[in-house]
Amino acid sequence: MQGDPEVLRLLNEQLTTQLTAINQYFLHSKMQDNWGFTELAEHTRAESFDEMRHAEAITDRILLLDGLPNYQRLFSLRIGQTLREQFEADLAIEYEVMDRLKPAIILCREKQDSTTATLFEQIVADEEKHIDYLETQLELMDKLGVELYSAQCVSRPPS
C-alpha cells in the first residue's frame, strides 16, 4: 500500500526521535545502575523498552506504506552526568517528541491517514505518562533535596 510521502517523512522523523530516546534512556539506566540507583535504573530501562515498542510500531507502519525506515539517523543524545541532568535531558526529549507529534497528527488526519494518526495519538498518551513521571521526579528532588531523593532510589540489600 503506497503511503503519502509527507506521512512517510513524519513517520521517519518520529522513528528518529524514538531511536534517539531508546539510546539515551538505555545509557542513563546503565549509569544509574552503576551509581547504585538500581530501582531507578530498572524504571529507566523499562522506559527505553517502551520507546523500542514505539519504534517497532512506527517501523511496521512505514513498511506497510511501502516506505523505508531510516535506522541510520539519530538526533544528538543528551547524557546527564547527575540524576537531575538525566531527568532534565529525558524531559527535553519527551517535549520534543510531543512538539513533533501534535502537528503530525493533524497532517495525518488532513491526508486521510487515520491509522497513522491513531498510532501517533497512542504514542502521545504514553509520552504524557513519561512526562508526568519525569516532572514528578524533578519536583520530588526539589522538595526533598538531592541527597534524600537519591537515598530513595537505592535498592535495599536482601535481609
UniProtKB/Swiss-Prot annotation:
EC code: 1.16.3.1
Binding note for cofactor: Binds 1 heme b (iron(II)-protoporphyrin IX) group per dimer.
GO MF annotations in UniProt: ferric iron binding; ferroxidase activity; heme binding
Binding site for Fe cation 1: E51, H54, E127
UniProt keyword annotations, A-Z: Heme, Ion transport, Iron, Iron storage, Iron transport, Metal-binding, Oxidoreductase, Transport
Residue sites binding Fe cation 2 per the record: E51, E94, E127, H130
Entry-linked SUPFAM superfamilies: Ferritin-like (SSF47240)
Domain Ferritin-like diiron: 1-145
Reaction it catalyzes: 4 Fe(2+) + O2 + 4 H(+) = 4 Fe(3+) + 2 H2O; Fe(2+)(in) = Fe(2+)(out)
One Gene Ontology term, aspect cellular component: cytosol
Gene3D superfamilies per UniProt: 1.20.1260.10
Amino-acid positions noted as binding heme b in the UniProt annotation, renumbered to this chain: M52
Single GO biological process annotation from the record: iron ion transport
Co-factor requirement: heme b
Known partners and oligomeric status: Homooligomer of 24 subunits, arranged as 12 dimers, that are packed together to form an approximately spherical molecule with a central cavity, in which large amounts of iron can be deposited.
Similarity remark: Belongs to the bacterioferritin family.
Primary role: Iron-storage protein, whose ferroxidase center binds Fe(2+), oxidizes it using dioxygen to Fe(3+), and participates in the subsequent Fe(3+) oxide mineral core formation within the central cavity of the BFR protein shell.
Protein name per the record: Bacterioferritin
Gene from which this protein is expressed: bfr
